[in-house]
Amino acid sequence: MADKILIVDDSIDNRKLLLKTLGKGDYILLEAADGKEALARAFEFLPDLVLLDVMMPELDGYQVCEALKQDPRTADIPVIFLSAKAETQDKIKGLDTGGVDYITKPFDRGEVLARVRTQLRIRNLMKELIDKQKRLDEDLRAAAVIQMSLLPQSLPTLKEIDIAWKFIPCELIGGDIFNVVLLDENHLGFYMVDVSGHGVPAAMVTVSVSQVLQPHSGYLKKKSDSPPYYKIISPKMVLEALDREYPLERFGKFFTMVYLILNIRTGKLIYSSAGHPPTVLLHPQRPLDLLSQGGTIIGLGGVIPFKEEEKVLSKGDKLIFYTDGVVDFQNQHGESYGEERFLALLRSLEDQPLELILDGVCESLTAFGHQARVQDDVTLLGMEFKDIS
C-alpha cells in the first residue's frame, strides 16, 4: 500500500514544487494551505509523513507539530519541517517540538526525496517492530495463562494434613510450578520446580515437566505384577529419570526441583532435592530443620548423584517449600531479602496457622521491597501434619 504524505505550506508555489518532486514516487499526496487545514487533514487521513512549513499565519508549524504530537492518533507520524530559516536554534526548536528532520528552502529535489525516503523507511520499520512486539506480548500473555493453568486447581483434602500455597508472578513469565499429588490412600507426593530463565521457552519446559509429573505418566508410580499392582517411585529415582529426560543440550534449560513423599498415616517422609532451596521443617518449640539432601540441578547428566533422606513428622510439624524468588528478591537499594531473614521470619511465625505463615512471608516481602515488583516468581507451598491416629 502506498505511503500517504501530507504537504503543508501557505505558498501554493512551494506546494506545487513539492507535489512535482514527489509525484513520480509511489506516494499518495495530500495538501493543506495552513495550520488549521493541516490538522483537519491529518486527523482525517492519518498520513505516514508530514512535510510542514514553519512560517504560516494563525498556527505556525511548531504549533501544528505540538498539536499532532499531543493527539494519540497522530503522535507517531513523523514531521519534517520546511523553512527558509537555517539557523541552528530554529532547527533545535523544530526537533524539540517533535520534528524528525529539517529541510531548508529553497528545496533541493534530491535532498527532499532522500529525506522523505529515509523517514518513511524508519516509520515502516517502526511499524514492523511494533507489530512484532504486539505478537510477542500476545505470546507472553498466552504463556502466562498457561503458567497459571498449571497451578493446583484443587488439592487433596485430608484430615491428617493442612495445605496452603501462595504464588506471586513476576512481570516476565517465569518457570515455577508445584503440586501435591495423591499417590495412593496412604501417600502424598509434593513437588516444586523452578525452570531457569523467563518467557515462552521457560514456560514450554514448565508445561512439559508438569505433564511428566502426572500420577498416570509412569514417572511417579508404575504398574506392578503383584499386589497392590503398582509401585511408588522413590524421589531419588524420579530425579534421575527427569535428569535423563531433560538434558541441558536438548532444551537449553535446566531446572531445580524438590520431590517429597509423605506417608500420611505414619508421618514418615522421604525426599530428594535437585539443587532446589532447602525445604524448611518447622517443629513446635524446637529448632527448625533444613531438608537439603539431594544432588545437582536437573539437566547436567547426573554430575553429582542424587541422595535421599528420611524424616518422621510429629503432630504440629510444618513443611515450607519455596523457590529462590523469595530469598533473591531485591529492594530498591539492591539488597536481597536473603535466607537468614526468611528463616528468622519463619521461626517467629511457627506457631501460627499455615495460611497466616505464608501471608506473613508475602507481607514481609512487600514491606522489604517498598512495593517494588518481584524480579522472579515468588512461590510458597506449606503443609502442616496434624494427626497420626
Question: What are the roles of these predicted feature ranges?
Answer:
Residues E31-A40, G61:
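Helix N-cap/capping motif at the beta->alpha junctions
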Residues M56, L68:
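Receiver (REC) domain active-site loop signature in two-component systems and cognate sites
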